[in-house]
Amino acid sequence: MVAIDQHDTYSVRVISRSHLSKDIVQVELEESSQRPLPDYEPGSHVDIYVQDDLVRQYSLVKASDAQASYQIAFKVKRDQGSATELMCELLRVGATTRISAPRNAFALDPQARETVLICGGIGITPMVHMAMTLVKAKRPWSMHIASRDGDELDLLGPLGSCSEISRYISSQGDRLPIRDLAERAPANAHLYFCGPEGMLQEFLAATQHRDPATVHYEQFQAAPSTGNEFTVNLARSGAQYVVREGETILDVLRNAGHHVTSSCRQGICGMCETTLISGVPDHRDRLLTDSEKASGRTMLICCSRALSPELTLDL
């Protein structure tokens, strides 16, 4: 594999596809001309360009160290026109699409004395590579998986026999004890979560008294945008808009007819990063470094807001 260029996109072809259950699809991708794809670390995801105006992020499931290919898995929502339903239709064996280089806002901490992985449903996908890496490094770890009916467990592959993995199947009356896990974890343990919003809120409540540097999570959906209203000025067009509580800059601009590239709406992918000309941003993303935020040069308009009455953007 090759080093990452964050600005690259790659044409990939579907070389295999399998249904782990009625609603869970696993797809393997290789570069269309069979050139090496970028290497990636546990927790990484790629943007998949489902259509020209529809981009979605999917975690990379490690296939094996010997393969220069990517695996993703997703749960199909049976809503007509949903992104996952379109993915299911378009990503058939032989089909091609474009993906971004891998990005990682959910990285394992190499200094963690112990790692606790907690996931719900299809949130297992980033955890598989994490667990494989921890096994290989012989570092202490455990994984706790909540699943409605166990469909996602096939993604574990050879990890399925590991004693470090606990399964909680809700259809059998099991419930993942997030608070107990957080309370029992040593103070220097790092906790990772990926799963649905309800479980995320339970995880955040259970870990609120822990060192924030040891608490890591990925969201399935964007959190509500809260805060005082402010004005956004567009330097190039001279347009001016008010962003109210509950709205994002991205939403306001799109509703006004501006085409702004975006994808995750959670402040993790970087596609909506915009140059800031003036004003004080309220950075709420999980992508920019502390020094990048302090510089005030750019902001992610899908989630970040303003600490000043006005912002002027290079748009």
Curated annotation (Swiss-Prot):
Matching InterPro entries: 2Fe-2S_ferredoxin-like_sf, 2Fe-2S_ferredoxin-type, 2Fe2S_fd_BS, Benzoxazolinone_Detox_Enz, Beta-grasp_dom_sf, Cbr1-like_FAD-bd_dom, FAD-bd_FR_type, FNR_nucleotide-bd
Co-factor requirement: FMN
EC top class, as a word: oxidoreductase
EC number: 1.14.-.-
Presence of the UniProt keyword Protease in the record: no
Keyword list, A-Z: 2Fe-2S, Aromatic hydrocarbons catabolism, Electron transport, Flavoprotein, FMN, Iron, Iron-sulfur, Metal-binding, NAD, Oxidoreductase, Transport
Listed GO MF terms: 2 iron, 2 sulfur cluster binding; metal ion binding; oxidoreductase activity
GO BP of this protein: catabolic process
Top-rank taxon: Bacteria
PANTHER family (UniProt xref): PROTEIN YIIM
Family under the similarity heading: Belongs to the PDR/VanB family.
Name listed for the protein in its UniProt record: 3-chlorobenzoate-3,4-dioxygenase reductase subunit
Organism: Comamonas testosteroni (Pseudomonas testosteroni)
Protein's gene: cbaB
